[in-house]
């Protein structure tokens, strides 16, 4: 089993299948189908991310360089967590965007959902 250690943003443990993206993760585009149409399989809707497009992200360890896109990232992650549609964890190779991190932090405080964020 591969173990990662890094700067913890939201603590937790994660044992899950990894999904690896070589490009940035557009939070809104990736979760649009789950949020708008109730896709319970949580398939990535970002057509500009060939590594993740149409892959189920539910309960997976997302290995990403960084988040990209608009300022909605935090709210999208909070909403995904509050609906229990989140990945098991998100591992970032670059510094984590504070707006995106805020969504996971708020979900950790305000809900019973957990989304660990680690900068490796």
Please report, for each region that a protein language model flagged, where it lies by residue.
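Feature captures the catalytic cores and cofactor-binding loops of soluble hydro-lyases/lyases
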Residues: 2-15, 19-117
């Amino acid at each position: 089993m591969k173990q990662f250690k890094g700067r913890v943003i939201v603590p937790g443990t994660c044992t899950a299948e990894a999904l690896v993206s070589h490009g940035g993760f557009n939070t809104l585009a990736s979760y649009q189908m789950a949020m708008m149409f109730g896709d319970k399989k949580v398939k990535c809707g970002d057509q500009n991310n060939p590594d993740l497009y149409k892959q189920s992200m539910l309960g997976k360890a997302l290995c990403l360089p960084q988040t990209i896109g608009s300022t909605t990232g935090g709210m999208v992650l909070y909403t995904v967590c509050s609906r229990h549609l989140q990945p098991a964890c998100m591992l970032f190779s670059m510094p984590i965007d504070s707006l995106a991190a805020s969504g996971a932090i708020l979900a950790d405080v305000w809900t019973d959902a957990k989304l660990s964020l680690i900068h490796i």
